[in-house]
Swiss-Prot record:
Lineage of source species: Bacteria, Pseudomonadati, Thermodesulfobacteriota, Desulfovibrionia, Desulfovibrionales
Species for this entry: Maridesulfovibrio salexigens (strain ATCC 14822 / DSM 2638 / NCIMB 8403 / VKM B-1763)
Cysteine disulfide partners in this protein: none
PANTHER family reported in the protein's UniProt record: PROTEIN ADENYLYLTRANSFERASE SELO, MITOCHONDRIAL
InterPro entries: SelO
Keyword match Ribosomal protein: no
Residues of the active site: D253
NCBIfam families tied to this protein: PRK00029.1 (NF000658)
Keywords in alphabetical order: ATP-binding, Magnesium, Manganese, Metal-binding, Nucleotide-binding, Nucleotidyltransferase, Transferase
An example Gene Ontology molecular-function term: AMPylase activity
Role: Nucleotidyltransferase involved in the post-translational modification of proteins. It can catalyze the addition of adenosine monophosphate (AMP) or uridine monophosphate (UMP) to a protein, resulting in modifications known as AMPylation and UMPylation.
Name this protein carries in UniProt: Protein nucleotidyltransferase YdiU
Residues at which ATP binds: G91, G93, R94, K114, D126, G127, R177, R184, D263
């Protein structure tokens, strides 16, 4: 594609038109020898994002060496509660937002480069990213999209040709992330903590206009905005729980206003079912354990509510009362979504008797530390008569046989055909997830041997997570004891 076409990309950088206190204007720091590794051509097509023709041009574009014409690179400022402790200034310490790309239908996409160099928010960091975390985010964010989970997306991965130094020298990389925006609860906290409620109002008006313009007609747009963010987060966390996803670092700076999953640093997927599962090496007290994710999301939303109080009502007492009522609504809404998601995993309608069935199944799984993903996937086969793959996952097989009988009674009560129940199960129980050991194997091959074939193969398999792919059966399997990943690291 020639330079003239590339130069007229339809950027409309609305965030850059906000006051300068919201960001630092800064260009990506060039890298020496960029090499394109992956380009998500399917996503580029959906966005109508024009790609250069040669690998060299792609590498220059997605490394940040030659930002597209029309972009206005900047680093966003935000604060955040990290593991419950407030940090008054964080911000994009290694990321640069190129701008907002707008498709012909008017859909707006943030395009951000991670690992693009130092900014004023780098806090003594080098602004770069090692290759490993870039591979992890590419694999997992695209898998999450295919699994039906709201998420940021991966557009490209570039090796920088430079080393970055952590505990050791590692190959560097730049990741291109696409999001509907990068506005976080922590963005609101930055201004509220400085008593800059003019900034909070500007940000709230901007977020409403960008994400939820219909709320401008509400009687109290700011209360409605808080309610909407609570709703999208309730839906998101319920979907995480359905697939056994553990984010690992649910700080307020990693909680989006849009309801998209963002920042895949120490994330992981549950192997053996245990609601207390934690993977992140820095989560010493299990704050962000699998089962705690809903309550942490609500805690984060209470932080957003605190920022919005002066906008919700001029009387502090009335503002608190209204905000509390909205945030308290998160619990029931989450439970409704979670129950529906989990019922779909066993092919039944979300009716009251199913609650006990679900509780019993999870208890049996917990007792056996049965693999979360495989147990649910094999339920469908067991229901149709092939119980062996399911029974192999459990220590006490009589319990699971007894459970299957109860399930069948409830199915009959709901008047659902077995085949229909199994179809529902297979649409909601993935055969393939980015298993932690497979992701680590892909990273090791790339970092140690410059071999990206395992990464590409894993991405290909995860493109169809709900389909049987017999030729890749080994990718369905839980890790062997020697392969098991017990801790994950942010790594950036």
């Amino acid at each position: 594609m020639d330079a003239e076409i590339i130069s007229v990309m339809p950027f409309d950088n609305s965030y850059a038109r906000l006051d300068k206190k919201f960001y630092q204007r800064i260009n990506p720091t060039p890298v020496k020898h960029p090499r394109i590794i992956l380009v998500n051509r399917e996503l580029a097509g959906e966005m109508e994002f024009p790609l250069p023709e040669t690998d060299a041009e792609l590498a220059e574009l997605f490394s940040g060496n030659k930002p597209p014409q029309g972009s206005e690179p900047l680093a966003q400022v935000y604060a955040g509660h990290q593991f419950g402790n407030f940090v008054p200034q964080l911000g994009d310490g290694r990321a640069v937002l190129l701008g907002e790309f707008v498709s012909s239908s008017g859909k707006r996409y943030d395009i951000q480069l991670k690992g693009a160099g130092q900014t004023m928010y780098s806090r003594n960091g080098d602004g770069r990213s090692p290759l490993g975390p870039v591979i992890r985010e590419y694999i997992v964010s695209e898998a999450m999209f295919r699994l039906g989970i709201p998420t940021t997306r991966a557009l490209a991965m570039v090796c920088s040709g430079e080393e970055v130094f952590r505990e050791q020298a590692l190959p560097g990389a730049v990741f291109t992330r696409v999001a509907s925006s990068h506005i976080r609860i922590g963005t609101f906290e930055y201004f509220a903590s400085r008593n800059d409620y003019e900034g909070v109002k500007t940000l709230a008006d901007y977020a409403i206009d960008r994400h939820y313009p219909h709320l401008k007609e509400a009687g109290n747009p700011y209360a409605a905005f808080l309610g909407k963010v609570c709703s999208v987060q309730a839906r998101l966390i319920a979907k995480w729980m359905r697939i056994g996803f553990i984010h690992g670092v649910m700080n307020t700076d990693n909680t989006t206003i849009s309801g998209e999953t963002i920042d895949y640093g120490p994330c992981a997927f549950m192997d053996g079912y245990d609601p207390a599962t934690v993977f992140s090496s820095i989560d010493h007290y299990g704050r962000y354990a699998y089962a705690r994710q809903p309550s942490i999301a609500q805690w984060n939303l209470a932080g957003l509510a605190g920022c919005l109080l002066p906008l919700i009502h001029k009387d502090t007492g009335q503002a608190k009362s209204r905000a509390e009522e909205i945030v308290q609504g998160f619990g029931p809404e989450f439970r409704t979504h979670y129950f529906a998601e989990m019922c779909s995993k066993i092919g039944l309608k979300p009716e009251e008797p199913v609650q006990e069935l679900l509780n019993d199944l999870l208890q049996i799984m917990h007792e056996s530390k049965a693999d979360f993903t495989l147990s649910f996937r094999m339920l469908g086969k067991a229901v149709l008569g092939n119980e062996t793959p399911l029974l192999k996952l459990f220590n006490e097989r009589d319990k699971i046989r007894e459970w299957l009988e109860k399930w069948d009674e409830e199915r009959e009560r709901q008047n659902i055909k077995k085949e229909d129940a199994v179809r529902t199960m297979d649409r909601n129980n993935p055969a393939f997830i980015p298993r932690n050991h497979r992701v680590e194997q892909a990273i090791s091959a790339a970092v140690e041997n410059d071999d990206f074939e395992p990464t590409k193969k894993l991405i290909k398999i995860l493109h169809h997570p709900y389909d049987d792919q017999p030729e890749y059966d080994e990718y369905m399997q839980p890790p062997e004891p020697t392969e098991r990943v017990y801790q994950t690291f942010c790594g950036t």
